[in-house]
Amino acid sequence: MFGNTTISKMLLDYGARIDSRNKEECLPLNHAIATNNKELTSLFLARGADTNIVDKYNRSVLHKAIGNNNITSVKLLLNHGIDYNLRDNHGYTALHYAITLQNREITDMLLSSGADPNIMNNEKHTPLYHALLYRSSNVESLILHGADINIVDDTGKTPLSNTYIDIIDNKNIEVIVSQFTILEYIAPDDIKNQLGYKINTDLINNNKRYSTIKQKCVHEINLLKAIKFHSGYSAEIFLIKSKSNIFHNSQGIQIL
């Protein structure tokens, strides 16, 4: 059935099972995606292939498509309503895969579709940890879609404190520290009492590189406070008004 769309269609017409598995527990759909065969992939999806069936490693066809950097198949699967938060045997979601493989386009597609940026793998690492580790260009996008910078892994570290300082590039450091500074400005006490928040506070305040960035952010916030409108409000109202929207998906910051 693999590779030839005409023959595959004929076999299906004669009753071939579209969800039959091989010894790896892979479906015909897996092989269509593995060979980047858009026509065959579309056929199997149209005939009702179950996109949420996983192989013996608990990997979905979406994991397979991302592993092959198969953007076309990823689009087809997302449009077909696949569960993008399925976890493999190591707890990695499709978003973990996309971040680790540094595929910005697929990462943005997953986030725009609603993929959860705070799902942990078996080591309790979220995609943000891997984004910092691999110097990903998607850190800002993760933050905008609700990634929690204060989440703690199984070693009691946040994504920032668990990543070697010298590894993180300047842009990503600026994104994380900027978000933390805004959070420090508007967060309620229950957030500030969380372990991850305290860890990041100590790290940022006691690291020269991080604290310098934070000081610049504080200066910019003070400049906003100094800007007065005719209504009597200052520009800091934009920070205050964002408070109702800012704690989304485990307190992920949504403004930059």
Curated annotation (Swiss-Prot):
Keyword list, A-Z? ANK repeat, Repeat
Query: PROSITE patterns attached here?
Result: ANK_REP_REGION, ANK_REPEAT
Name one process (GO BP) from the record: protein ubiquitination
Ranges: ANK repeats:
1-20, 24-53, 57-86, 90-119, 123-151
Q: What domain of life?
A: Viruses
UniProt keyword NAD present = no
Gene3D superfamilies from the UniProt entry: Ankyrin repeat-containing domain (1.25.40.20)
Q: Key word Repeat present in the record?
A: yes
Recorded protein name is Putative ankyrin repeat protein FPV231
Q: Supply the source organism for this entry.
A: Fowlpox virus (strain NVSL)
